[in-house]
Amino acid sequence: MPKIKMIIGLGNIGKEYQDTRHNVGEWFIAKIAQDNNQSFSSNPKLNCNLAKVSIDYNNVVLVFPTTYMNNSGLAVSKVANFYKIAPAEILVVHDELDIDSGEIRLKKGGGHGGHNGLRSINQHLGTNDYLRLRIGIGHPGHKSKVANYVLSNPSIAQKKDIDSAIDNGICFLDDIINYKLEPVMQKLHTK
């Protein structure tokens, strides 16, 4: 059975995007690094900011692509090749429009669902056989509003809900790393 060796936090690079809904994946890995007293260092060769942590006695690389969302797959494939990490050993954490704020879901494989970061990762890895931790940001109501919505900051109440979802996901990280997926899915997916 595989173990997770790399966690990707999707988002856009730059201070202007740091607090936007589209960067909740970055928020997630930043919290992991902070909880483990680690900081990210820039790795231009691998197109990312990188930190290394130990989770439940497993060495895990935290990756924030510096390529912007639409080309995240470039960094993911470079880091995976450099560290010899298989797609099944990758966890991608990203924002999810189709899940309410404050909720979080774990998924194995599947399509990109219109998410450009996932689309890029699927293309660069040549597969969609990796784990995804989907952090709900809610939907603005109409597809014409999506781009502005994901690139804007959440309200104070919504930020609190998203932070709660991140904390909830981190509580289950040991089991996710060790591929104990069914119990995690049952707990995360039950209201």
UniProtKB/Swiss-Prot annotation:
Pfam families: Pept_tRNA_hydro
Catalytic activity: an N-acyl-L-alpha-aminoacyl-tRNA + H2O = an N-acyl-L-amino acid + a tRNA + H(+)
Positions that bind tRNA: Y17, Y68, N70, N116
UniProt entry keywords in alphabetical sequence: Cytoplasm, Hydrolase, RNA-binding, tRNA-binding
Catalytic residues, chain numbering: H22
Record-listed E.C. numbers: 3.1.1.29
PROSITE patterns to which the protein is assigned, alphabetical: PEPT_TRNA_HYDROL_2
SUPFAM superfamilies: Peptidyl-tRNA hydrolase-like
Site (Discriminates between blocked and unblocked aminoacyl-tRNA): N12
Cell location: Cytoplasm
Keyword Cytoplasm: yes
Principal location class: cytoplasm
GO CC annotation terms, alphabetical: cytoplasm
Annotated site residues (Stabilizes the basic form of H active site to accept a proton) in this chain: D95
UniProt-recorded Gene Ontology molecular function terms: peptidyl-tRNA hydrolase activity; tRNA binding
InterPro entries xref list: Pept_tRNA_hydro, Pept_tRNA_hydro_CS, Pept_tRNA_hydro_sf
Annotated family: Belongs to the PTH family.
Assembly mode: Monomer.
Protein name, per record: Peptidyl-tRNA hydrolase
The gene coding this protein: pth
